[in-house]
Each structure stands twice: as C-alpha cells, then as structure tokens.
From Swiss-Prot:
SUPFAM superfamilies documented for this protein: Recombination protein RecR (SSF111304)
Protein name (record): Recombination protein RecR
Toprim domain sequence ranges: 81-176
Family: Belongs to the RecR family.
ZnF endpoints (C4-type): 58-73
PANTHER family: RECOMBINATION PROTEIN RECR
Function (record text): May play a role in DNA repair. It seems to be involved in an RecBC-independent recombinational process of DNA repair. It may act with RecF and RecO.
The keyword Zinc-finger belongs to this UniProt entry's keyword annotation: yes
GO MF annotations, alphabetized: DNA binding; zinc ion binding
Length: 199
C-alpha cells in the first residue's frame, strides 16, 4: 500500500533516480516542491524542460552549450594552444573559478572503467587526439579526477598522444586522492594548476 498519493509517490521515485539523492532526500525535496507556490514549482518544471530541449554538447570541446560552440570555445581571448582535459562538464566550473587557466577544454564524457564497461571508444578520446593533431596544441593538461579511474584515463591519454609534438601535464598533488574536481576548493585547485607535472 502506498504511503502517499500516487502523484507524490511518482515524484519521490523520479527524484530518487538522481545521483546522490536517496529516498529520504527525495521525499524532502518532493514535499518542499509541494509546499512552494504553484508558480515556483512550474518554473522548476519549465527550467527542466528548457534545459532538455536546448542544451547540447559543444561541437568542438563537448562542454554544454545552447549553440554550436560553447562560450569558452568562442572566446577569442582564450589560449588555443592549450587544452585542459576533464571528465565531465561540471569539472569546468571549479577550474574556471580559480582564474589560473585561460586555455580551452575537452570533455571526455567520463573515465575509463573496464569493470563498469567503460572502454576508450566510449569516451571522446579519439576526438581529443584529432584536436591535438589538427589544432596545433602545445600543451595537454590532464585534469581527470584523482582516483583510480581518473588516473588510468590520464595514463591512457598520455600513451595515445606520446608520438605527437605536445607537452602532456597533469595537475599537481594537493587534490585529495579518490576525490572529485567538482568538490575541490578554488585555492587548492589553483595551486594544482600552477604546479602541474609532466607525464
């Protein structure tokens, strides 16, 4: 027997499918939505609809954008000879907030994880290698997460571009092992960029 009305149970179930949202958090969010004014709840629903209709990957770096290219790729002030490789679009925000980096990005779409069935062809590694070849990239900064899958991904990419005339670096230590870039504070991340090491 359901505890709540069918529509409430459905909302809780859908919210529970989001990453890091368990059943109790989903229930709290659902009841928060129910308590808000109708206009606020509908604004949230409209924002969800809009993002699903408008957002797509940048054709160049695979960051999120509403157009063909993201704002970073379109910015003529960016250093086009340097590409920072990240796992996911949400890794770009913390790096940008450091103010230490003015190059371009490449979003892989995850990290290698054979146990989870994520192989090199499942990521945008081939597209990265092609960019390095065709865009005259001088430096490739591998800013994958400091965990087992991130490190394996960085080492794989370093091997893939070893014959190309590009400097390959990784962020310096200071980031917690096993952590994710999205949770790193700007000072630590800025120092990791400033002290990056050759691979």
């Amino acid at each position: 027997m359901a505890t709540y009305a069918r529509s409430v149970e459905r909302l809780i179930a859908e919210l529970s499918r989001l990453p890091t949202i368990g059943p109790r958090s989903a229930q709290r969010i659902a009841f928060h939505i129910i308590r808000t004014r109708k206009e606020e709840a509908l604004a949230l629903a409209e924002a969800l609809r809009e993002v699903k209709e408008r957002i797509r990957p940048c054709r160049r770096c695979f960051n999120l954008t509403e157009g063909e290219e993201c704002d970073i790729c379109r910015d003529p002030r960016r250093d086009r000879s340097v590409i920072c490789v990240v796992e996911d679009p949400y890794d770009i925000g913390p790096i940008e907030r450091t103010g230490e980096y003015r190059g371009l990005y490449h979003v892989l779409g995850g990290a290698l994880s054979p146990l989870d069935g994520v192989e090199p062809e499942d990521l945008r590694i081939a597209e990265l290698v092609e960019r390095v070849r065709s865009e005259g990239t001088r430096e490739l900064i591998l800013a994958t997460n400091p965990n087992t899958t991130g490190e394996a991904t960085a080492m794989f990419i370093a091997q893939e571009v070893r014959e190309l005339p590009v400097r390959v670096t990784a962020l310096a230590s200071g980031l917690p092992v096993g952590g994710d870039l999205e949770y790193a504070d700007e000072v630590t991340l800025g120092r990791a960029f400033a002290g990056r090491r050759e691979l």
